[in-house]
Swiss-Prot record:
Record keywords: Nucleus, Repeat, rRNA processing
Pfam families assigned to the protein according to its UniProt record, in alphabetical order: U3_assoc_6, UTP6_C
Protein name (record): U3 small nucleolar RNA-associated protein 6 homolog
Main location: nucleus
A Gene Ontology BP annotation from the UniProt entry: maturation of SSU-rRNA from tricistronic rRNA transcript (SSU-rRNA, 5.8S rRNA, LSU-rRNA)
Purpose: Part of the small subunit (SSU) processome, first precursor of the small eukaryotic ribosomal subunit. During the assembly of the SSU processome in the nucleolus, many ribosome biogenesis factors, an RNA chaperone and ribosomal proteins associate with the nascent pre-rRNA and work in concert to generate RNA folding, modifications, rearrangements and cleavage as well as targeted degradation of pre-ribosomal RNA by the RNA exosome. Involved in nucleolar processing of pre-18S ribosomal RNA.
Length: 597
């Protein structure tokens, strides 16, 4: 092994001598490079090979290459690249080759190899790398697409890209992304041929080998892919994705029309089809051939007409397809348009009216989802229509009695409208909902009570909540209760609440840390109380939380009434209680602290 390493170091000598001779590196730097290179070579030639060693080797060489580039730029010296950089790049490729052969399954390693070759100008090597990678990772469509794009965009070889896509589709005959990218590639190829033809015609040159059939120039190959793909992959979503790609190419108008017509013919029962057809009206001028509107008012009128046409299509859609999904598309469109900024008051009014009407119609047909009831309520509240918002909230909770979100929305409307029935409605919500989902409502009730009721009433709510909410959900509630106690009654009240809850498991570390913080804000801050809180916290989390132990030690060291002599005992207790990685982490933190970091 020593002979191999020596030989590889000797292979570096010519490039290192050149680096020193042309003044890019000093003699001392060259010696440091040789020492580092020897260490790295040893690691990648020992019997037990580690991937990290190969990665470190490559990273060191890349860093060195980049440093050479920067120093070349600084002294404006660009010669001897074949003797320096090319030699280094070739060596890195060899290391990447060994690593990718050893760890074939590591996709990230292959991708790093590819990125390196692209950056350092060894693109001729890339075809072989892609072939080797795809032989192992043929089950990953994204890698086939990457290879095909490289052939098309970097090597300008549409034929090689086409062959890769065809091979990929044999492995993945029902992969939408492959068909989409293959379709895009053929359209790009046709566009490129058309531009070449135009250039030849402009120059009045003989077309020769560039004289392609008219069908190819019109995108016939893309059309064949489209037809094959829709026979394999069903659904309007895929169909629409191909149409969106085709619309990027102006020459493909006939293909766009064919795809659009097929979409309407094949997917009339899919809400996405209707949604696409309706939204398309936004792009079509109301009166083709006429001058475009110039003034803001004229533009607003034109936009109003387009939106009206969209809504007419949606109205037809919800009659033909009266489903929740179809109404969702319609309402989403209305909300999107209403959220668009406009200085036109009439246009904004039209948008609001259309949105409200769509919500009402869907509600009457019982085709509104829970989310849309919430959207409707939010919209009404933004317009200060509290009475209508409450009516909608009532209807929503009737339909979705088991939804805590719906109840919370309704209760928030009652709170915002300063209803006298808030307390009664909270009780009603708890009667309908399962206790384990009620945490958000208990918190809302307590927050409302804090601003609207007496301290006694608020505490009564917290006490009820602690009994009602059990398990992990109760942790947040206890923290909220402690916070409220400190806000409303100061430290004395918070300590009383802490004492009352200290056996009501489960807890969070934050629960104890809050109490420690409250203590630290007192004058004087009593170390005896801090010890009590740390001990209570460690009883619950001493086996896993290394930070608690470290903070306890620091407290004894830094507090005016701390006992530094206790630190040794705390350290050994921590070592006994902490388990696994937590113990290792604690030892490392303790060592850092002792070293003054």
């Amino acid at each position: 092994m020593a002979e191999i390493i020596q030989e590889r170091i000797e292979d570096r000598i010519p490039e290192l001598e050149q680096l020193e001779r042309i003044g890019l590196f000093s003699h001392a730097e060259i010696k440091a490079i040789i020492k580092k290179a020897s260490d790295l070579e040893y690691k990648i030639h020992r019997r037990t090979l580690l991937k990290e060693d190969f990665i470190n080797y490559v990273q060191y060489e890349i860093n060195l290459l980049e440093l050479i580039q920067r120093r070349r730029a600084r002294i404006k010296y660009s010669f001897k690249k074949d003797e320096i950089e090319y030699s280094m790049v070739h060596r890195v490729q060899g290391v990447f080759g060994r690593a990718s052969a050893k760890w074939k399954d590591d996709v990230q390693l292959w991708l790093s190899y590819i990125v390196f070759c692209k950056k350092w100008g060894t693109k001729t090597h890339l075809s072989k790398i892609f072939s080797a990678m795809l032989a192992i990772h043929s089950n990953k469509p994204a890698l086939w697409i990457m290879a095909a794009k490289w052939e098309m965009e970097d090597r300008l070889s549409s034929e090689s890209a086409r062959q890769l896509f065809l091979r990929a589709l044999r492995f993945h005959p029902e992969c939408p992304k492959l068909y989409q990218e293959y379709f895009r590639m053929e359209l790009m190829h046709a566009e490129k041929l058309r531009k070449e033809k135009q250039e030849f015609e402009k120059a009045a040159m003989d077309m020769g080998d560039f004289d392609h059939p008219e069908e190819i120039l019109k995108g016939e190959l893309a059309r064949i892919i489209y037809k094959n793909s829709i026979s394999k992959i069903k659904g309007a979503e895929f169909h629409v994705s191909l149409l969106a790609i085709a619309q990027l190419f102006d020459f493909a108008k006939d293909l766009q029309k064919e795809i659009y017509d097929d979409l309407q013919a094949l997917h009339t029962d899919d809400p996405l089809t209707w949604d696409y057809v309706a939204r398309r009206e936004l792009e079509i001028e109301s009166q083709p051939g006429e001058e475009q509107p110039v003034s803001k008012q004229a533009k607003a009128v034109e936009m109003g007409r387009r939106e009206e046409r969209c809504c007419a299509v949606y109205e037809e859609a919800v009659k033909a397809l009266p489903t929740e999904a179809m109404w969702k598309c319609y309402i989403t469109f209305c909300l999107e348009r209403f959220s668009k900024k406009t200085s036109s008051v009439p246009l904004r009014g039209q948008r609001l009216e259309r949105t409200m009407l769509a919500f009402r119609k869907a509600h009457e047909l019982k085709l509104l989802s829970e989310v849309q009831y919430k959207q409707w309520i939010d919209l009404l509240l933004r317009q200060d229509l509290f009475k209508e918002a409450l009516q909608v909230a009532e209807a929503g909770t009737e339909l979705f009695k088991d939804s805590v979100t719906m109840w919370q929305t309704k209760l928030q409307v009652l709170i915002d409208s300063k209803s006298p029935d808030v307390e009664m409605r909270f009780e009603e919500a708890f009667a309908h909902l399962k206790p384990q989902v009620c945490l958000p409502l208990w918190i809302s009730w307590a927050e409302w009570s804090e601003s609207a009721k007496s301290q006694e009433d608020t505490e009564a709510i917290f006490k009820k909540a602690i009994i009602a909410v059990t398990g992990a959900s109760s942790v947040t509630l206890k923290e909220k209760y402690l916070d409220w106690a400190y806000r409303s009654g100061g430290y004395k009240k918070a300590r009383a609440v802490f004492k009352s809850l200290q056996e009501s498991r489960p807890f969070s570390v934050e629960f104890f840390r809050k109490m420690m913080q409250f203590e630290k804000e007192q004058e004087p801050c009593k170390m005896v109380n801090l010890r009590e809180y740390y001990e209570r916290a460690l009883r619950e989390f001493g086996t896993s939380d290394s930070d608690l132990w470290m903070d306890y030690i620091k407290e004894e060291l830094n507090h005016p009434f701390g006992k530094p002599e206790n630190c040794g005992q705390i350290y050994w207790r921590a070592m006994k209680m902490l388990q696994g990685q937590s113990a290792e982490l604690f030892v490392a933190k303790h060592a850092m602290h002792q070293a003054g970091h």
